[in-house]
Regions:
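Iron-sulfur-associated redox domains of electron-transfer enzymes in respiratory
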Residues: 62-256
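Iron-sulfur cluster-binding cysteine motifs and their immediate structural context
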Residues: 2-9, 15-40, 45, 49-65
Length: 256
């Protein structure tokens, strides 16, 4: 199965210390037999543990941020933002909306609303089918792990769209003005790129890490921007979706 590369190795920085292999949950995607470790992308689940562990800066996530910045002023673009923005840009998530619109993004949507739709479908699936086990699937690394290494778990993956997919489909259906707009997806996850390619929705995968690095490099202060507002209805509970227990807290809305 061909998988888009989401993690790169800088050969000049890699010292072949194998820290990346030690923390990798699947091991097989790494080849440490040369002077530097290489990645077999078709076996990499894209979890990013190796990036965190590499003290030499030899591993980086691959996203579309540079391409997005090149094209944003010349294309019709909207952005959707993951609930994790409240953690990655603590206290400045609303200013991020204003910054995005200042560079040419026409509309910004909160994925928390899509997370509530996803959770609703989880609850409906459980009530209807009474499965022995349900594995939530917002994380593409988990999905890839099941597909590549534990196929016996595939039957337990929730047969529902992810919060990102729900949000994009909601925009296409209820906001016809943006039907032909490019969609920039802002999240902590490099592996999300694979999901968007599979469902053929989403054009730019932008990691919050690379976005924060850009702000630091260019001395952009988000607190100098006014608070912006999302262009979709606010979520009731799923703003905490990315925190421990966030999914269950959201599910309580649908379970009396």
């Amino acid at each position: 199965m061909a998988l888009t590369p989401v993690i790169s190795v800088d050969q000049e920085k890699c010292v072949n210390c194998h820290r990346c292999i030690a923390v990798c949950p699947v091991k097989l995607c790494n080849d440490g037999s040369k002077d530097y470790v290489t990645i077999r992308h078709e076996l990499c689940i894209g979890c990013g543990k190796c990036i965190e562990s590499c003290v030499h800066g030899a591993r980086r996530g691959i996203d579309d941020f540079e391409l997005f910045m090149q094209n944003v002023k010349n294309e019709n673009v909207l952005a959707i933002v993951a609930p994790a923005v409240a953690v990655s840009f603590r206290g400045k998530d609303k200013q991020l909306i204003s910054w995005l619109k200042s560079i040419g993004v026409e509309a910004v949507f909160d994925v928390s609303f899509g997370a509530e739709l996803t959770t609703k479908t989880y609850v409906e699936h459980i009530k209807k089918n009474n499965p022995r086990l349900v594995i939530a699937q917002p994380c593409p690394a988990i999905v890839s792990y099941c597909e590549l290494y534990q196929p016996e778990l595939l039957e337990y993956l929730a047969p529902c769209d992810s919060p990102m997919a729900h949000t994009m489909k909601m925009i296409k259906k209820f906001y016809p003005k943006y039907e032909n707009y490019k969609i920039a997806v802002i999240s902590p996850c490099y592996a999300k790129k694979r999901e968007y390619e599979e469902i053929k929705l989403g054009d730019y995968n932008i990691s919050m890490k690379n976005l924060a690095e850009y702000f630091s490099l260019h001395d952009i202060k988000l607190d100098t921007f006014e608070n912006g507002t999302y262009d979709n209805p606010p979520a009731e509970r799923a703003v905490m979706y990315s925190t421990p227990g966030g999914l269950m807290q959201t599910a309580e809305r649908f379970v009396p």
